[in-house]
C-alpha cells in the first residue's frame, strides 16, 4: 500500500523526508525519492500547484517513486523548506514557481550530486543579453504562456459582444506579463478595435493569494463594460469566478480546466501542462537520464493550449474555433511569432510603491519576531546548563536549523567568552573574547535581549548579533545565547523576488547612514554620509538626513540609474523595521519617469 505525506515546514525541520512504504515492482526499478515544494497559494489552489501535484502523483502511481510535499508559508518557510529538502535524502527536489529560482541556483551548486527542477525558472541575462549559466544539475522548466494566451485572447475578442474584454494578473512579473502580452496580441490580431482592460493585484507574491481583491478588480472591469475576463492570478482568480457568477458574464480560467468554478460561464481555460513537465522530469531522473538546462514547452510541445471539449464547445461557435485552430497551426509552424512583452513601457503608481514597502516591512518584522521567539525559548532551555555542554550544542543546532539566514549560533559566558558555536565550521572561535563589542556591554548593563547594529564579527563577516540573556536555576546571570545573522542573506530572500521584477531599488540603512543591504550589492557596506560615491549628490545627502531623522516619509533626489551609469530623478518612500530599539530604515526608490503622473 502506497502512502503519501504532506508535511508542514515545522515538521520538516525534524525530519524532512519520511520513509514511505512502497510495495510495487516499479519501486524496485526506480527507487528515487522526490521532494516537491509548493508555490504561493499551496496545494488545492485549483491551478498551478495542483497541476504539479498531479504530475508527481502520476509518478508515484506509475513509477513507484516516493513523494513528499512541502507547503511553506512565507519567504522564511520557503528558505527552510528548500534547505531541508536539499540536505535530506531526496534524490530530486522540485520547486514550483519562479520565486524559487535564485535559491535553486544556490542549492544546486552546493549539492552537485542531487538533482533539482524549478518550474517557471526565472532566466537571468548578462549585459550582452546572453543567458547567465546555471548548474548542470538544475533543470529549468519554462513555458511559452504567451502562445496559449494568444489563442484565448483571440477567442475572447471574437466572442465579445461589447468590444471590451479584461485581463486580471496576479503579481506584476515577467511571467504574468507574458500571459498579458499574448492575450492582448491575440485579441488585437482578430479584432484590431477590441479594447482590453488590464489589472494586476499586486507587486509581491501575495498578489497570487488575494481572492477578495481579485473579485473587486473583476467587478470593476465588468462594470466598465468588459464581458469576458481572463485571469492569470492563482488563487486570486477565485474572485473573478465569483464576480462572473454575480454578473452572469464570461470568465477564462488558467493552468488547468477551471470550468467547475463557474459552471456554464467559463468560456475556456488556457492550459499549462505543468503536470506533464513534472512527470517527465521525475521519469528521466528515475531512469538515470536526467539532464539540466533550460527546457521550453509551448504549443508545439503540447506544453500549453486551451480547453475545447464536450462541456464548453457549445460556448465557442464553430467558426471561432476554426479560426483559432488556424492561428494555432501558424504558431506551431513558426509562421507566427507571439510577442512576450507589451510594447508599452510599464509604469508604477505611488500606491504600488507604498504597498510594496508595507509588505516588505511586515515580512522583515515576521522574521525578526520569529528569531526573537526562538532565542527566548533557547535561553529558557539553556537555564541551568553548562553553556559548553553537548546539551547546549543541541539547543544551538535546533536554533540554527530553524533560521536559515544565520551565520552561526553560540553561547557566551558571563565573562564574554564564546563557549559553544554551531555549525562545526566555526568551532575554532570558541574561547574568543567579545567584551569589546558594544552590544555585549549593553546586555551586561540591562540584562535584557539586545539586537546590535552591523559590525565586523570575530568570525569575519559583517553581521548583526541578537543576544538573549541566560540565567541559572537560581536566577543568576550566566551569559547569553546568541544568533549571528547576515543581513544580506536574510534580506535578499525577502526583497530579491520583488525587486528583480520591478524597476525599483530597495535598500536598508542604519540610522548612522550605513547601508546594510541594497539590491545593488556594490552599495552594501557603504556609508551614505562618508563614501565618495554619494558626495556629488547634495539632494541625496539631504534626503538621507531626513530618512535618518524620521521613521517614515517620502522625498525626491538624483542618483545613478542602475545599469545605465546616468543620474536620474528618483522618488523614495521609507518606513522603519527593527527590534529592541535597533532601527533599520527600509527604503524603496523608483525613477520618476517610471511612475504614473
Predicted regions and their residues:
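Short N-terminal helix-loop-first-beta-strand/juxtamembrane motif that initiates sensory/input modules
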Residues: 370-376, 398-420, 448-449, 496-517, ...
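A residue-level marker of the well-folded mature domains of exported/periplasmic proteins
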Residues: 27-346
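Solvent-exposed, extracytoplasmic
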Residues: 389-403, 480, 484-540, 594-597
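Bacterial N-terminal signal peptides
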Residues: 8-19
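Juxtamembrane extracytoplasmic/periplasmic/luminal helical "stalk" adjacent to the first N-terminal
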Residues: 344-388, 398-406, 465-466, 579, ...
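Extracellular/periplasmic juxtamembrane segments that couple receptor/chemosensory ectodomains to their
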Residues: 533-597
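Extracytoplasmic/periplasmic ligand-binding sensor regions of membrane-associated signaling proteins
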Residues: 421-492, 496-497, 551-569
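Short regulatory alpha-helical segment in sensory/regulatory domains of signaling proteins that mediates
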Residues: 365, 382-383, 396-404, 444, ...
Amino acid at each position: 500500500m502506497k502512502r503519501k505525506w504532506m508535511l508542514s515546514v515545522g515538521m520538516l525541520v525534524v525530519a524532512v523526508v519520511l520513509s514511505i512504504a512502497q510495495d510495487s515492482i516499479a519501486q524496485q526499478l526506480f527507487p528515487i525519492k522526490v521532494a516537491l515544494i509548493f508555490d504561493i497559494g499551496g496545494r488545492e489552489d485549483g491551478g498551478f500547484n495542483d497541476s504539479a501535484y498531479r504530475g508527481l502523483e502520476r509518478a508515484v502511481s506509475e513509477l513507484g517513486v516516493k513523494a513528499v510535499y512541502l507547503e511553506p508559508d512565507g519567504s522564511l518557510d520557503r528558505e527552510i523548506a528548500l534547505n531541508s529538502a536539499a540536505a535530506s535524502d531526496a534524490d530530486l527536489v522540485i520547486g514550483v514557481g519562479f520565486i524559487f529560482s535564485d535559491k535553486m541556483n544556490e542549492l544546486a551548486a552546493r549539492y552537485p550530486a542531487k538533482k533539482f527542477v524549478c518550474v517557471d525558472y526565472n532566466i537571468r541575462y548578462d549585459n550582452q543579453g546572453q543567458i547567465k549559466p546555471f548548474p548542470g544539475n538544475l533543470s529549468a522548466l519554462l513555458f511559452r504562456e504567451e502562445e496559449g494566451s494568444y489563442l484565448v485572447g483571440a477567442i475572447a475578442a471574437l466572442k465579445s459582444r461589447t468590444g471590451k474584454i479584461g485581463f486580471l494578473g496576479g503579481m506584476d512579473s515577467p511571467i504574468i506579463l507574458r500571459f498579458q502580452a499574448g492575450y492582448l496580441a491575440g485579441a488585437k490580431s482578430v479584432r484590431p478595435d477590441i479594447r482590453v482592460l488590464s489589472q494586476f493585484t499586486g507587486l509581491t507574491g501575495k498578489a497570487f493569494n488575494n481572492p477578495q481583491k481579485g473579485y473587486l478588480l473583476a467587478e470593476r472591469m465588468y462594470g466598465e463594460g468588459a464581458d469576458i475576463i481572463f485571469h492569470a492570478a492563482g488563487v486570486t482568480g477565485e474572485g473573478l469566478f465569483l464576480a462572473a457568477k454575480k454578473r452572469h458574464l464570461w470568465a477564462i480560467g488558467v493552468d488547468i480546466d477551471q470550468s467547475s468554478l463557474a459552471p456554464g460561464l467559463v468560456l475556456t481555460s488556457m492550459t499549462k501542462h505543468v503536470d506533464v513537465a513534472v512527470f517527465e522530469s521525475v521519469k528521466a531522473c528515475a531512469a538515470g537520464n536526467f539532464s539540466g538546462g533550460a527546457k521550453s514547452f509551448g504549443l508545439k510541445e503540447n506544453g500549453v493550449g486551451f480547453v475545447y471539449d464536450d462541456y464548453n464547445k457549445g460556448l465557442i461557435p464553430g467558426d471561432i474555433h476554426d479560426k483559432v485552430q488556424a492561428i494555432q497551426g501558424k504558431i506551431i509552424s513558426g509562421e507566427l511569432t507571439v510577442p512576450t512583452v507589451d510594447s508599452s513601457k510599464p509604469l508604477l503608481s505611488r500606491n504600488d510603491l507604498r504597498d510594496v514597502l508595507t509588505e516588505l516591512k511586515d515580512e522583515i518584522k515576521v522574521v525578526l519576531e520569529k528569531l526573537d521567539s526562538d532565542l527566548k525559548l533557547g535561553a529558557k532551555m539553556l537555564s541551568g546548563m553548562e553553556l559548553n555542554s553537548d546539551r547546549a550544542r543541541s539547543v544551538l543546532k535546533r536554533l540554527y536549523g530553524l533560521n536559515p539566514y544565520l551565520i552561526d549560533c553560540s553561547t557566551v559566558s558571563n565573562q564574554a567568552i564564546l563557549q559553544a558555536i554551531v555549525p562545526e565550521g566555526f568551532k575554532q572561535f570558541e574561547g574568543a573574547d567579545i567584551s569589546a563589542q558594544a552590544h555585549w556591554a549593553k546586555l551586561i548593563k540591562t540584562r535584557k535581549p539586545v539586537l546590535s547594529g552591523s559590525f565586523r564579527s570575530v568570525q569575519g563577516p559583517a553581521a548583526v548579533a541578537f543576544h538573549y540573556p541566560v540565567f541559572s536555576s537560581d536566577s543568576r546571570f550566566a551569559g547569553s545565547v546568541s544568533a549571528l545573522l547576515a543581513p544580506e542573506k536574510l534580506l535578499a530572500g525577502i526583497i530579491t523576488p520583488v525587486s528583480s521584477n520591478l524597476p525599483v531599488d530597495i535598500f536598508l540603512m542604519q540610522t548612522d547612514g550605513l547601508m546594510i543591504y541594497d539590491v545593488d550589492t556594490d552599495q552594501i557596506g557603504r556609508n551614505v554620509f562618508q563614501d565618495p560615491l554619494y558626495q556629488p549628490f547634495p539632494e541625496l545627502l539631504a534626503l538621507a538626513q531626513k530618512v535618518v531623522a524620521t521613521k517614515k516619509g517620502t522625498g525626491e533626489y538624483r542618483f545613478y540609474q542602475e545599469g545605465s551609469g546616468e543620474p536620474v530623478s528618483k522618488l523614495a518612500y521609507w518606513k522603519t523595521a527593527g527590534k529592541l530599539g535597533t532601527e533599520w530604515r527600509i527604503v524603496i526608490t523608483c525613477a520618476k519617469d517610471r511612475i504614473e503622473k
